[in-house]
């Protein structure tokens, strides 16, 4: 992903790392090069990686991370974005299906939302929601006790009334509008 005039490559899910791609040409004095940025933290897929304001957020097998916090503190657990819900993330989600997660920035509401499969299921029916309007951010979960709409994918789209609306696409080909009111 391109972020702040840098090209970043997230490696995972086994050998976790983030790398910078430097250079401006395939050969010569300014040839492309891969420079390690951090090890021990990396992305598990491109669908869960997105921007929040001036930062990137992404899930890994170890938790949900902020690139800014990772740059400052590395893989220090206390700096994980999902630190307040880390035991839930590590104990209650299906880790063999983590790579199928989907995330979206619902910017008009100040929410970062990811869909995950709970333990014992391959259906992504649990949503982890990070409200970044507050400092520190606040976490919530939709579908933790009762499955929510199974979301194979998530999207925020602008309706004809210029209102941003959250949608979930299911494996059966249906699209559900998740935003029902302000």
Regions found by a protein language model. Give the residues of each.
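Beta-sheet-dominated scaffold domains
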Residues: 1-182
């Amino acid at each position: 992903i391109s972020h702040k005039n840098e090209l970043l490559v997230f490696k995972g899910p086994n050998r976790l790392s983030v790398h910078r791609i430097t250079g401006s040409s395939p050969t010569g004095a300014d040839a492309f090069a891969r420079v390690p940025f951090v090890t021990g933290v990396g992305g598990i897929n491109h669908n869960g990686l997105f921007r929040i304001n001036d930062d990137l957020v992404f899930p890994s097998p170890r938790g949900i991370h902020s690139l800014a916090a990772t740059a400052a503190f590395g893989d220090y657990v206390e700096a994980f974005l999902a630190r307040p819900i880390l035991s839930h993330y590590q104990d209650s989600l299906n880790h063999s299906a983590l790579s199928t997660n989907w995330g979206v920035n619902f910017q008009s509401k100040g929410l970062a939302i990811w869909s995950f499969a709970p333990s014992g299921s391959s259906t992504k029916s649990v949503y982890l929601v990070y409200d970044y309007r507050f400092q520190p951010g606040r976490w919530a979960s939709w579908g933790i006790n009762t499955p929510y709409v199974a979301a194979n994918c998530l999207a925020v789209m602008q309706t004809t009334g210029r209102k941003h609306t959250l949608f979930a696409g299911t494996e059966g080909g249906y699209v559900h509008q998740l935003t029902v009111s302000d």
